[in-house]
Amino acid sequence: MRPPTTARCPGRVLQNPWRSFWPLTLALFVGMGQAQRDPVGRYEPAGRDASRLRRPGGSPVVATAKVYSLFREQDAPVRGSPPAELVQPSWGSPRRSTEAEARRPPRAQQPRRVQPPAQTWRSRPSGQQQSAPRARAAPALPRLETVQRPRAARGRLTGRNVCGGQCCPGWTTANSTNHCIKPVCQPPCQNRGSCSRPQLCVCRSGFRGARCEEVIPEEEFDPQNSRPAPRRSAEGPPSLRRSSVARESTTARVRPPAPQLQRARTLSGLSQTRSSQQHVGLSQTTRLYPAPAASGQLTSNALPMGPGPERRDGAPQAAYLDRPSSSWGLNLTEKIKKIKIVFTPTICKQTCARGRCANSCERGDTTTLYSQSGHGHDPKSGFRIYFCQIPCLNGGRCIGRDECWCPANSTGKFCHLPAPRLDQEPPERGPRHRAPLEGPLKQSTFTLPLSNQLASVNPSLVNVHIRHPPEASVQIHQVARVRGEAEEAPEENSVETRPSPRLPAGPGPGRWDSNRIPARSGEAPRLPPPVVPRTPALLGRCYLSTLNGQCANPLPELTAHEDCCGSVGAFWGVTSCAPCPPRPASPVIENGQLECPQGYKRLNLTHCEDVNECLTLGLCEDSECVNTRGSYLCTCRPGLLLDPSRSRCVSDKAVSMQQGLCYRLLGPGTCALPLAQRITKQICCCSRVGKAWGSLCEKCPLPGTEAFREICPAGHGYTYSSSDIRLSMRKAEEEELARPSRDRGPKRNGTLPRPAERQPLRAATGTWVEAETIPDKGDSQASQVTTSVTQLSTWVPGGALGTPTPSVPEQGIPEAREEAQVTAPTNVLVTPAPSGIDRCAAGATNICGPGTCVNLPDGYRCICSPGYRLHPSQAYCTDDNECLRDPCKGRGRCVNRVGSYSCFCYPGYKLATSGATQECQDIDECEQPGVCSRGRCTNTEGSYHCECDQGYIMVRKGHCQDINECRHPGTCPDGKCVNSPGSYTCLPCEEGYRGQGGSCVDVNECLTPGVCTHGTCINLEGSFRCSCEQGYEVTPDEKGCKDVDECAIRASCPTGLCLNTEGSFTCSACESGYWVNEDGTACEDLDECAFPGVCPSGVCTNTAGSFSCRDCEAGYQPSALGHTCEDVDECEDPQSSCLGGECKNTAGSYQCLCPPGFQLANGTVCEDVDECVGEEYCAPRGECLNSHGSFFCLCADGFVSADGGTSCQDVDECAVTDRCVGGQCVNTDGSFNCVCETGFQPSPESGECVDIDECEDLGEPICGAWRCENSPGSYRCVLGCQPGFHMAPTGDCIDIDECANDTVCGSHGFCDNTDGAFRCLCDQGFETSPSGWDCVDVNECELMLAVCGAALCENVEGSFLCLCASDLEEYDAQEGRCRPRGAGGPSVPEARPGAHPPGPVRMECYSGQKDQTPCSSLLGRNTTQAECCCTQGTGWGDACDLCPDEDSVEFSEICPSGKGYIPVEGAWMFGQTTYTDADECVMFGPGLCRNGRCLNTVPGYICLCNPGYHYNAASRKCEDHDECQDMACENGECVNTEGSFHCFCSPPLTLDLSQQRCVNSTSGVEDLPDHDIHMDICWKRVTNYVCSHPLHGRRTTYTECCCQDGEAWSQQCALCPPRSSEVYAQLCNVARIEAEREAGIHFRPGYEYSPGPDDLHYSLYGPDGVPFYNYLGPEDAIPEPLFPSTAGRPGDRIPLPEPPLQPSELQPHYVASHPGLCCCKNGEEVGSEAVSLPSSPSAHHCQQEHQAGFEGLQAEECGILNGCENGRCVRVREGYTCDCFEGFQLDTAHMACVDVNECDDLNGPAALCVHGHCDNTEGSYRCHCLPGYVAEAGPPHCTAKE
């Protein structure tokens, strides 16, 4: 490969290398992507473009291909630059060309220094040439060496950029990886620049150059040109001037150049011109850059060049040419006023069903939209289009015709120049106004070639922007100029619609008014070569998460893959979804592609910009979205908080911490049954526990109301935790918010900014909207508001905006523009505008924003509202930041608000408000009480000062403390100093003290000689005392010692004679057993045990004056005198007798002789020998069961016990006379067989011979047309038909239709024909006659006893009437008695005869003992008056009305059948109520027979008390029996407990096996209770008090049986206590809560559960007959069994009461606390639909819909494997989950409820089982307490016995 040929400039001079550097740098960025390396590391073009770049001469590509040497030195000359005449001239400026040349070395040579050319040329304005000094030669670019990867043992290189097992040139491996993804820049990038691609440095702001080695100069602002300029250009006046060459009118004559031309430098190479004459506009030098077309060639930017003014950027542009333009600089878009855009929309909608979503797209009509002045709008289709004739580079965005909005890193008309350094203040932005469109629109941009242009060269590219609904996508077919219409009259935009084939036609063609611009004449158009348009990005559905492996939470609009995965999306797809690829943590460029981190998107080839997620619909539900850098925040209004999902606002009342009482019962005006602890309102009302809350008894809101959703946003059973929710009312911090990218514009230097003129568009609603607005810097929500045309996220410099001017004539040079006029005050703007246009009406009401628009003849004026000011753009009002003026005057912190401000005063100041003005005023602290006590207060600014009084000192601000003068030693030198407030006092010293340094010190009297003779002197504070020697005592004044007469004390020589001496005494003549000690002061005891032979077989213990024998050996005891040990006859001691054997005494011990069947254990107890172990005494005909001292055989079926029960023999079943009737009996071992005769067969149930019914088994063929009659053992055939049939002529037997006679059943019934017979079905009130052939009336008055009570009964046909004796009374069918007319409650309408009365009222039932009030205790809830008063109740109703006496008339009316009988609801006989026995055990549940078992009888009930209890008829419960009154608890202390007792023994005694006696640990016991010393049968099941299913293989004790699997024990079938009782808890030493849990699983009310095992524990009634809701508290009680059996047998008219039936699936649907379940009175419907139970026609319950997302499910409906065992399946919004029972926790990995090991949980609230051992169980745990402790519940623990 050879270097491209270069051409020298023939006679042209390049003036300034700075003006050519930036355009060529841009060409470098584009050209490098299409180039390849040469062997020395340089880039050469690749592919078919290589030949073009090697062309000699004036191709514009040559400048691009030769730009690389500029990086060596920017002032180096460049060879082969194009001739100056081929460069596109700017408007009114001389043509410029590059000044430097670069030369590339040959391929095989090392780079060498470039030699400068012999001569360079500089261009003059007149076109002459002059010589210029030579430029410096640039140093050679160093050769790029191939970077070798580190020699690490990581294996072979993988991934991209790998060439031949090594990293490709320019790449190296990243740290700790084997991937070649790290680019290499040599030499490295300077000034902290980053190497983004090989040999490509991305510079930080403020730096530039190939290696970021150059600092960008600071800029100055030229107020006349409004363009940035380098601060270093100090030459020339501030007004940068350059001559302009203009063309007058439409002729080709050239105006002479202006005099006094001065050269000026601009930062970006743009030459700017301002003429003092009539030349108006900004001139711009055209730069070359590669267009993003497929050809890869560099094309012009299609700048308008034609004559006349051209409106660009809102300002008139005049172009003047000094010569005809060449073909390379043609104006390709000149006079393009009307554009035709042909596109086809595709509407895509999402359809979701059963958790699956699918996109359905429908292609719309092909629409042709004619856009004039760059804008077009289809008001019917909802599409808005504007196009750009120029492409915007580096991520720029087209916002109008020939107008680019550039990102922060670029500037210039096409965003092709690097941005200046960001060290200046950004321009202030106006607020963005959301366009009043019909709905949110989405913008799509397409870069397409413009067809039908005026020049036959490379087509110009335009950007077409289409705003359309989000669910639509658009395909552009053609963008073309409308030919032949340039000379026509002013045109209007129009829309043409062409229906697509096979689809219904879309909206028809429509027209709309737009801005009319006069058309101008132009050159004839020439067709361009065809170019394939670019395909828009594919749109799909964006999903936020997945659920059960499927994509979920889709966004409502279709998005592109990059927009979805780069912002909030996790999955994306069109027909199916795929996960989004991972994003890097920071921007990374790999293989030329820029990878942006999450929350950012590509701005250009090297920069990423923040994604405004708040533009995405559906992110923050019921909250406000705030965009942040790389993410977003959901904020709530004051009073609302974000929930844990951070996407939903809930009321702060949902997490209120205010606590109060929760009431479980709400009556008329009263609250009752409060909970013991105070809880919050949401826990009380959201958990269904409470009905009212708080000190004011606030009623809990009803579900579905707004008040309920306010405190329970998640519904019933769920509350929010305050620790999971944080207040979100703060504003996002400045560093969190996403700042829009911005171009730092120049400072304004006091001049007014020129507002951008925007062409108004007419929206579909007919209102006027702005085509574009400039964002305001102070608007915090600028990044969240979209305009009606496009969404912009960048700032533009103020100088880049033009100034609105009046219209100009079509031909000729425009006059000098008028400057904008500003009038006082500053918030009023007068803007010139074309006459005749009402700007205030055109801008609707928001043209000025928060202000008033005043129309003027030449414009309009904005009068801003208070708190607002005129925006620097002079176009509207914006918020006035009053804080900039320091309205708080430094006394507080100013916080600006929209239209106002707030002062937060510092300490020492207070807020003073006067209208809209706020200020901080000083607080006079001296006026406040308690300030500067004991001092003088002086107020200061923001504070105060205290001056203390004399005698006080300041210790802290505002507090004067007394000075303690006594601290100074010289205050009182001869006395005691006493301090006083503000002063002090000197006092004289007391006796024993002397003055010293202001205080009194003690005098040491012990220093005086002769003090305390016969003792020691002890100095005291102010005195002294004497401590005397032994034998002396202190005198009364304690200042001397005297002798003690020891003999006067009785304790001296108690066993001898005492003699007193001075200071001592002596003893003599001691008693027996004592002797005088050595010093003679005492008679000491004589130790007899020191002599040998004392106390044989024992231990000698010395005593005072004697001795004794103690601790005799085993079998011995001390004698009567205690001097010897004698043998003990243990057989005479009842406590030492052999238990179950005979005792024999021995020397020092005894022996036990056991009877047969027993064996000696522990030497003292005869234990039973288990003969069944190891021996098969009863096998194989029975099972051996051990007994006390023997055994017996439990024989199998067919065997009987023999030999005294020790063996089993066969039973001869054939000995029974009636065995095997119709056959012969054959006895077998353990059974028998029947050999049946012909016509008989063995019965599969009993084995007996039963007759074979041949007529039934063989059917009709057996007798043919004859009738078959069965007989024992045979059958016979009889000629004729069965009764009820007649023989047809064909010989067949046909049924006789007796019902053909209409009168066969009379007039009160109808006939029902049956096969061979008929029956009469009678009307209500009639019954079948004895003959069965007709219906007769039923006399209810005779049949039903006292059916009308005390009223008269009158029988009528088919019914009966109850008549009252007095006309002033009427019969109340509901109460069953006569009542005065109009008295007592609401009138009851008269029921028709035979109608069922409404259901009775159900209320509370009370009972009381004889010596207490009748309403002392609550017996039951939800009972009728008859159920209460006819059974055990003494009071009924809310007011506890007393039940009538049994001998009263009222009692007969309520209970006509007597005590114990109640009416059956829904069961009627002949129009009368049916009465049956009341099951008190079911009706009152735990209210009866507490601590026992309730057994229903007819009538009444009986109580079977648990062991340790006796029945108390007065209280109707089993009360504890005090065993301590009956038994002595021998040798110990008896303590009674509930249902039992305990014996406590004192050491060395211990409790024996009977637990009732304290015995010596070495002795035995006797007379133990049978159930403790005996091992007996353990029965596993008890059915109707009959024991079955014995525990095979072993016998157990009573405790072992009942505490494990047994329900009864011993051959007497002794029942075990219920597992939910206290007796069971004490017997088995477990806590009460454990006993309740073992009794069965009790469910939470209000839910639907999965099916459970069909056993006793899962039924609606517990093992002790108590309904399961008993464990849920009285508030959850249900009125009656909800599954009553009323079906009975077919012939029963009065169904007998049966236990509640267990449904096939455990579905507690009708619990009282179930959502929507109401206790309805009188059959009313309360709040929802009343549903009748199929088994009870009169029983109603109210049912309403579950709250969505929180209902329970049955197993077959649950979407979880195994249906949540140990829990319940609950459907939530995301699918299914398990609500585990207590003691289980959810394992989310397996979606199962697993047991919680409470014993291993060291993080629990308290240590478990203190004073005991913790044993984990399935779903719970139990505590095994140590001796001396008993188990307690809540939480389970062990407490000491009382």
Swiss-Prot record:
<comment type="function">
    <text>May play an integral structural role in elastic-fiber architectural organization and/or assembly.</text>
</comment>
<feature type="disulfide bond">
    <location>
        <begin position="1070"/>
        <end position="1083"/>
    </location>
</feature>
<feature type="region of interest" description="Heparin-binding">
    <location>
        <begin position="93"/>
        <end position="114"/>
    </location>
</feature>
<feature type="domain" description="EGF-like 3; calcium-binding">
    <location>
        <begin position="610"/>
        <end position="650"/>
    </location>
</feature>
<feature type="domain" description="EGF-like 18; calcium-binding">
    <location>
        <begin position="1520"/>
        <end position="1559"/>
    </location>
</feature>
<feature type="disulfide bond">
    <location>
        <begin position="905"/>
        <end position="920"/>
    </location>
</feature>
<feature type="disulfide bond">
    <location>
        <begin position="1299"/>
        <end position="1311"/>
    </location>
</feature>
<feature type="disulfide bond">
    <location>
        <begin position="662"/>
        <end position="684"/>
    </location>
</feature>
<feature type="glycosylation site" description="N-linked (GlcNAc...) asparagine">
    <location>
        <position position="1162"/>
    </location>
</feature>
<dbReference type="GO" id="GO:0001527">
    <property type="term" value="C:microfibril"/>
</dbReference>
<dbReference type="Pfam" id="PF07645">
    <property type="entry name" value="EGF_CA"/>
</dbReference>
<feature type="signal peptide">
    <location>
        <begin position="1"/>
        <end position="35"/>
    </location>
</feature>
<feature type="disulfide bond">
    <location>
        <begin position="685"/>
        <end position="700"/>
    </location>
</feature>
<feature type="disulfide bond">
    <location>
        <begin position="542"/>
        <end position="564"/>
    </location>
</feature>
<feature type="region of interest" description="Disordered">
    <location>
        <begin position="295"/>
        <end position="318"/>
    </location>
</feature>
<feature type="disulfide bond">
    <location>
        <begin position="1430"/>
        <end position="1455"/>
    </location>
</feature>
<feature type="disulfide bond">
    <location>
        <begin position="1053"/>
        <end position="1067"/>
    </location>
</feature>
<feature type="glycosylation site" description="N-linked (GlcNAc...) asparagine">
    <location>
        <position position="604"/>
    </location>
</feature>
<feature type="disulfide bond">
    <location>
        <begin position="1341"/>
        <end position="1353"/>
    </location>
</feature>
<dbReference type="InterPro" id="IPR036773">
    <property type="entry name" value="TB_dom_sf"/>
</dbReference>
<dbReference type="InterPro" id="IPR052080">
    <property type="entry name" value="vWF_C/EGF_Fibrillin"/>
</dbReference>
<feature type="disulfide bond">
    <location>
        <begin position="1545"/>
        <end position="1558"/>
    </location>
</feature>
<feature type="disulfide bond">
    <location>
        <begin position="614"/>
        <end position="625"/>
    </location>
</feature>
<dbReference type="InterPro" id="IPR001881">
    <property type="entry name" value="EGF-like_Ca-bd_dom"/>
</dbReference>
<dbReference type="GO" id="GO:0005509">
    <property type="term" value="F:calcium ion binding"/>
</dbReference>
<feature type="domain" description="EGF-like 6; calcium-binding">
    <location>
        <begin position="922"/>
        <end position="961"/>
    </location>
</feature>
<feature type="disulfide bond">
    <location>
        <begin position="671"/>
        <end position="697"/>
    </location>
</feature>
<feature type="disulfide bond">
    <location>
        <begin position="1481"/>
        <end position="1494"/>
    </location>
</feature>
<feature type="disulfide bond">
    <location>
        <begin position="1195"/>
        <end position="1208"/>
    </location>
</feature>
<feature type="glycosylation site" description="N-linked (GlcNAc...) asparagine">
    <location>
        <position position="175"/>
    </location>
</feature>
<keyword id="KW-0964">Secreted</keyword>
<feature type="compositionally biased region" description="Polar residues">
    <location>
        <begin position="121"/>
        <end position="131"/>
    </location>
</feature>
<feature type="disulfide bond">
    <location>
        <begin position="189"/>
        <end position="201"/>
    </location>
</feature>
<dbReference type="InterPro" id="IPR018097">
    <property type="entry name" value="EGF_Ca-bd_CS"/>
</dbReference>
<feature type="compositionally biased region" description="Low complexity">
    <location>
        <begin position="107"/>
        <end position="120"/>
    </location>
</feature>
<dbReference type="GO" id="GO:0050436">
    <property type="term" value="F:microfibril binding"/>
</dbReference>
<feature type="disulfide bond">
    <location>
        <begin position="1758"/>
        <end position="1769"/>
    </location>
</feature>
<keyword id="KW-0358">Heparin-binding</keyword>
<feature type="disulfide bond">
    <location>
        <begin position="1415"/>
        <end position="1440"/>
    </location>
</feature>
<keyword id="KW-0732">Signal</keyword>
<feature type="glycosylation site" description="N-linked (GlcNAc...) asparagine">
    <location>
        <position position="1301"/>
    </location>
</feature>
<dbReference type="InterPro" id="IPR009030">
    <property type="entry name" value="Growth_fac_rcpt_cys_sf"/>
</dbReference>
